[in-house]
Amino acid sequence: AQIYEKVKEKEKMSDDIKTLNEIKNIGKKMEASISEYFSRIGINDPTTNFDWEYILIEKKQKNAWCMPGGKIAIYTGILDVTKNTDGLASVMGHEIAHAVAKHSVERQSRGLLLNVGTKIIDVASGGVLSQINSSTGMNTVGLLSQIGIMNPFTRTQESEADYLGMIFASLSGYDIRETKKLWQRMKNANKGKETPQF
C-alpha cells in the first residue's frame, strides 16, 4: 500500500472525472461479479479483504496495472486503444485477474486457479458461466469459445489473467468479444513491436 500511495503522490492524476467514474463503475460491477463467481463455485473469495481503489493517471503510456489488494491504475494513454467501455472492461478484467491470481497463489497456492479451471468445465453446462450476458445475449462459455479460448490453464500466467479477466468482465455484463479487437488495436498502436503486457 505504501508503494501505491507513493505512485499517487508522484504521478499526475487525470482530471477526467467522467472516465474515472466509468472506471469506478466497471470496477464495482467486477467486484460484485468476482464475489458471486467464487461463491457459486464454492471457493472462498480471495478478494474479501481487498480495499479496492481506482485511479486514472495522466500519462501517454499505454498501460494499466493492479497492485495486491485491489489498487488499480489506468493510464490515459491506453484509452486511445480501449476505445469503448467493453475495451476498458477487458483491460480492467485482465488487471483484476492478476490481483486475484497473485493473492490466490500467496494464500492458497496455484492449485486454486487450476481448481477454478476444473470447476469451469464442471459448470459449463449449466452453472455460473452459463448465465446469459445481457449485453450480448450469449453466455460466457459461448463467448469464450467464440473467441477461441476454452482451456488456458496449460498456458502462461498472462493467458490465465486474460481468461479469468474475460470471465469477470462477461459476468459483469461486458462484451468480451471486444478483447480480441483490443489486442489487435494494441498491436497496431505498437507498430509491429512486441505487444506490451499491461
Task: Identify what each model region corresponds to.
Residues 1-198:
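A Zn2+-metalloprotease active-site environment signal
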